[in-house]
Structures are given as structure tokens and as C-alpha cells.
Amino acid sequence: MQRTELMTWLQQELAVDMFKDYAPNGLQLQGKSDIGHITCAVTASLAAIEAAIENGSDLLLVHHGWFWKSEPTVITDWKFKRIQTAMQAGLNIAGYHLPLDAHPQLGNNAQLARVLGLKPLPAKATAAVGVADAAAAAQPPGFGRFG
């Protein structure tokens, strides 16, 4: 698939224009024009970039991308290393913050709820962005293994 076609689809599917965010949503670093393999991660860290390259990915799709509102704008040190590594491999990096928080099927909250077997509340039941479950309040806190 062509990068421009995929970015257009993501822009529309995730309703990016509906969100006022702290960071840019969409393509943050342009790489190869053909996208055949995608790696997903929470953050565009050096470890995630290296894993995407090792996996033969053409796109690293992340929840926490780069260039946050209050972040320094200079490209030095860790930011330089990440950008350099991705550019040398032709790796595209796209980040979607609030759009992935809110999407009812593809979003982080929706996917976590699916894995946990939770059912979403009706849209009118909560003002919060994302997916909630009425049973969540009755569940003890802590971590567990699923799957």
C-alpha cells in the first residue's frame, strides 16, 4: 500500500481533525513510499524503532509520537539518534495520540476492553473519552495475565 493512501485512511478512520491535541497526529517522519509491514508501539522510542527495523517494517505506528507541545524543538541527543536511525532505514513514523484514545474499535481503550472481556457503556453513560465498563468499579485493583 502506498504511504499516502494509508495516511489518508488513518486520518479519516481515526477522525484526526476532531481532536485538539498536545502533539501532531499523523505522519511525523517520512520514509519509504511503499508500506508492506507495520509495527505498533506505545512510544517512538529507540528500542521500538530498532525493533521495527529488525522486523522489516516500513512504518512504526505509535500512540506517543514526537514533537509534543512543550517539548524542546532542537534535534539533539536522544531525539537525534531516534530520527537518524529511522531515516537511515527509510522507516516511516506516525503517531496518533487522542484519536487512538477515543476510537471505538481501533483505539487503545477499546482494544484493552476487548482483551479484558469488558462491554462498553452506552455513549450517554460517560462523558470521558474512551471505553468504560460498569463492572470496572467492582473489580479489585492490580495486574493480571490475560490470554
Regions of interest found by a model, annotated:
Residues 1-147:
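Hydrophobic structural segments
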